[in-house]
Each structure stands twice: as C-alpha cells, then as structure tokens.
Amino acid sequence: IYGHTISPHVGGGTNSSEYEMLSSNSLMLMPSITPFNWLNLHKANSLVSNLKDLGYATLAAHPYTNSNYRRDSAWLTLGFDETHFQNDFPTKETYGSRPYQTDSATYRDLEGLYEAMPEDQPRFVFLVSIQSHGDYDMNPPEEDIVHAATDYGEYDSIMDEYLSNIYMTDRAFGELTEYLTEQYEKTGRKVIVAMAGDHAPSFVDHVADHTFTDENNLQILERSTPYLIWANYPLENAGQTSATDEYNRMDMCMLAPTLVENAGLPLTPYYQYLLALKQVAPVVTAANDYMDADGVTHTYGENAELDAWVHGYFNLEYNNIGAKATRQQNLFQVEK
C-alpha cells in the first residue's frame, strides 16, 4: 500500500511529523509549537500506549544524538520500553562527506536490537533515520549516484545529492524487507512496516512548478511525502494507488490508524473516527485548509458538511490533549 502523507511543515520540523504520526493529533490546533519540547506527554494517548495495552513490547531508536527534540525523555514518557541512540548503532557508515549514518547501516544495527526484544510478546519498533538529513551540498559532484533529468539551474547539484540519498534509502529499504522476509520464513513471525518521509526538503518551493496548480493545492503538494505500508505476508489492500482512493493521499495523523487497521488490530474509537474522516477529508492540514476525497482543497467555512467532520475531529483531539481529569479515556484506548 503506498501513496503520500501530508507533513505539517516543509524543510524541517521532524518532531512535528513524528508527533502527528505517533499521537494522531493534528498540529492545526497548536501550529507554532515543537511538540516534544512543549507538551506534557505524561499519560498521553498514542500508538505506543495503544499497542502496550495489547501486550506489545515497544522500542524507539534514532542513530544520532539523544538530545534532539528531547527524544531521550519524550520517548520514555510516551511509554516506550526501551530507547536507543547513536551509541547503540555500532556500524559507522556514511555516504561520501556527509556525516550521517546511512540507512543501510542503521537497518543492519536495528536488526540486532529487534532480535533482542522479548520473544514472548509482539513487538513494536519506531525508528527515526538520519541519512537524508539536510543540507544537500556536502558531497562533491562525483559522489552523486543520481543526476536529475530536469534542469534545475542553481539547484542542480543540490537536487542530485538529495536524489542520491533517496536512491540509497530505497535500496536500504529493500535490504530490510529481505531480512524481514527471511525472518518470516525462519520463525513465522509476521511483520508489517509503515515508512513515511518526515518532510520535503527546504528547497522544494524553488524547484516546484508554480504554474501547475493554485497556491492552496501547491502548498499541500509541497508538504506531500511518500509513504508505504509493507508486510512480509499478503496484505488485503496491497496495490491501492489510484488518484482518488483513500490510500493515495492522507494526513500524517491518519497513518497510524491506517497501519493498525491493515494489521488487523483492534481500533480505538478515536482511530475509528479518523478512518471515517479519511473517507471524506483525508487531509486536514496544520494550515487553514483541508482536502476532500476527490482531491479538492477547501478552507474552513466553505462546506458545512465537511466542516462538521473536521470540527468533530478537533473536538476529540481537544479532549485528548486537554485536561486529563476531564478526558473521556474510553475514546482513546482499545476496548478490553
């Protein structure tokens, strides 16, 4: 299953995408914050808490410093059983002059962390990779693997380095899927993987075709990043990619419910509402607009029926992140 998710930002703000992905809470209600630095995550509802309620062992990892966005404390507060950072990734491998761990090396080290998790529990692993982090002018041209076919003028060399990183990410993901397929053949353990880009590069507006569509559509397209859901066993909805189907373009907040649904796990009422919302308004942005199921963008106040759906979501979100004493917790956890 593959398509595009819509990131809250362009050119940065990984933590915003990370928060929306884990919590399914849109930053539309809090557009100017860095979630892990500003929000009280104690007893926060998230994909982590939902899976722990189902008996999962949980692990979060990032092959870089633990201080970025306070991940060292934020992940533990969210409920991850264990967290791992650069010292737990011993395979030091970089691409050319770039200082960041390659995805291939990251996945190889992650395999060891994954295999060390409890064998008697299902496992949830959350990884934030680092290979394709900006900037994209670190390597000499001879290090580029991919060269853009389109002339981007002064952005040619930057585009080449960026696309070379994407190419390497693609190959590394292939290595990971081969490993997980072999694991299934050896152990019978089923694994489903969701992979998504955190945000488009900062130069995207400089290389975008501004004649292609209006500014409302363009800003959504510029914040679109690829996602895929893959499993080492047959997925019922595999191959859904048409321009208007529900899997083609969706908000980052809807990725976790979509993953949980395709994994065949119980859905919280919050996730159920988001999946229903996805049928009518699959994109609810951190800007002042949203996209309907036909790919048409709207600003709030244009369509009363769609507004009601979106406002219903925001009411649920407000209850979720507001005062915990008045939160209707049954809406945000699986029924036991």
Residue ranges and their predicted role:
Residues 1-336:
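Solvent-exposed soluble domains appended to multi-pass membrane proteins
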